[in-house]
Amino acid sequence: MQIEVEKLTDFSLMKKVVKHVFNLDTRASLAKWYNSEHSPIRTQLFAIFAYDVPYSVCMQMRTHDKNGALFLIESGRPDAYGSDRVKSQSGNYREQPRNIFIMCNAQHLIDWSHKRLCGKAEKPTREFFSLLKRQIANVDADLAKMLVPKCVYRNGLCTEFKPCGER
């Protein structure tokens, strides 16, 4: 599994939006904005290219597309697009890893991390999101610090019916 992340916008856009919408010249750092989780952080957009992602992880991540993020998942059907990669795979197409593209904002990533870094998440999903967090750190270290399991976010309070006991 491999993940590449591109940050599509920068802090200057967020400052311009804050000035335009709220008539404020913000002096707060990007880290402070991420910590506040106020709506302007949604101006920080990311393109994520993930390769050979387990099918189960693709499907778990896809559950997050209802909040405005874009998810495009490589088809596993041998009759779709005539891909040599797909044609070379034999057996149940649901067992084959997929390439996935995600376009999302900073708030999406913060919200998803609460579930996907949780000890109750499937191990391959935690591995995927841990790798994603490391790649996010390469383009936005302030955001990467905010990507934590919900129990960390809530200072040790776990809201799962059966806590994992990690914290």
Across the structure, where does each feature detected by a protein language model lie?
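Family-specific signature for flavin-dependent thymidylate synthase
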Residues: 1-167
